[in-house]
Amino acid sequence: EDFATGIRDADAMLGKLTEYFSQVDEPVILVFWGDHYNPIDSNYDIYTRSGYASDSSADPRLHQTTLLMWSNYSDRAVDLGTIAAYDISPVMMELFGLRQPLYFQFLGRQLRAAYRANTRGTIMEKDGTTSNELTPLQQKWSDEHWLLQYDLMFGKGYALGRMGLEELAEDAE
């Protein structure tokens, strides 16, 4: 009952928000997303007994959630497929034609070139299959991702030149 009530209330609030913001003159983008499935019971039993997922908590389907992006200035429907949580903002900015910071541009390139997601040792391939091992190309992108994150948080900008993204850094100035 609690889960169903939560779904009903979230749906009602989504309706109120979109109704309100559809009347606003300024551009608005709303992003609705949950970071995990509700286990409903212990060990995700309802998902495994229904055949939706395997009996392993590592099953990628148990870690995918629905994502909804809504805007009051675009009614284009897009199926995003599976993307990592860290790609939500870059994908949203690209879809709605917003200027992206360097880091988001890198994530967009990685999403198109290497994999749909790389989280906790599980790789979601571009074709939707999963793997636990990175290809050499994926390893290169993963290493560059780590290097860029480290450099942006603690470094002095060394990663920008190494990744061939100097022109993006100049555009951001």
Kindly label every feature range from the protein language model:
Residues E1-E173:
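Solvent-exposed soluble domains appended to multi-pass membrane proteins
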